[in-house]
Amino acid sequence: MKYYAVKVGKKIGIFETWPECQAAIAGFKKPVFKSFLTKAEAECFLKGTDYWQSVVEKDLKAGYLVAFTDGSFSKELTKFSYGVHLILPNGQKQNISGCRADREFLKTANVAGEVFGVIEALKWAKENGFKKIKIYHDYQGLARWITSEWSAYSKISLMYVEFWASIKPEFNEIKFQKVPSHSNISFNDVADKLAKEALAK
């Protein structure tokens, strides 16, 4: 389900169908509107506040290490990369990025980078003594493989599930949060930029 928030138009508000949204902006010069997957995001848009900023702030107050992860891939360079933007409970930030060319994973393109982003985030968390981590990602397989919602058949998914099984006991809590890709979420944009820069090195 989508929620349509009209900030500037004939009628201001949140609508649950596209026809309702169209009626609220039809004939209005330069309307401002946007669709969202949750009502909370739509409400923040109308208020002019950052929804994901507020969500992350709640995570940090709850003691989570927050990790935004992303991956990239270059067919021409035959390599993939990952970027991780970490936000510590005390507000400090840490960035991780890297590039790999594992032949057995290349055919999965940027998915390999997404996977290694999570792996590196968990490794960093373990090495630095964090027991609670929330991982934000835009590829749904990262959470679904470990819950067996998706079957792990590919080499990258099998490796990922095996790694997960080995590191999970080191944590008290690991949460996953899918975010929409290419939606101007500032934290995710940092991870995306890190991955792309690593690929270019």
Would you name each region that the model predicts?
Residues G48-V55, D59-A62, S97, L199-K201:
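Eukaryotic low-complexity, Ser/Thr/Pro- and acidic-rich intrinsically disordered regulatory regions
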Residues P31-V55:
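Short, mixed-charge low-complexity intrinsically disordered segments
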Residues A24-A26, K58-D59, A165-E170:
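Short, conserved catalytic or adaptor-binding loops enriched in Gly and charged residues
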Residues S72-T78, V118-V190, L194, L199:
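RNase H catalytic domain
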Residues K58-A112, W124:
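RNase H-like nuclease fold core
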Residues K2-K10:
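A short beta-strand micro-motif
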Residues G9-I14, G27-T38, N128:
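A short, exposed loop/beta-hairpin motif centered on an aromatic-Gly-Thr core
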